[in-house]
Amino acid sequence: GKGLILPTETVASNGGAHIYHQYTIRVKNRDSLAKRLTAAGIGNSVYYPLCLHQQECFSNLGYNEIDELCPHAVCAANQALSLPIYPELSEDDQRRVAETIGALLT
């Protein structure tokens, strides 16, 4: 009920697992959460703020003005927020990120 969607963990048929080059969550009030995380000293980023059909390089296709054709893509683009993830991120720092998000979303 906090409006938070975490990445889905899946295992490939060969036993492989995701390595998370980016750890992207979806949250309803993304911009507000991003500002509050930044204020708390926690890095975050919106890597893909626009859907493909909204990007200038595809404007000649005529889809940039009709978001209702892609409501799920538009929703995801408006909610996606990438959190810090890198090999040197300690478990304590991971815990701090998770606890801060939990506190900010309550």
Summary of predicted features, one role per range:
Residues 1-106:
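PLP-dependent aminotransferase class I/II
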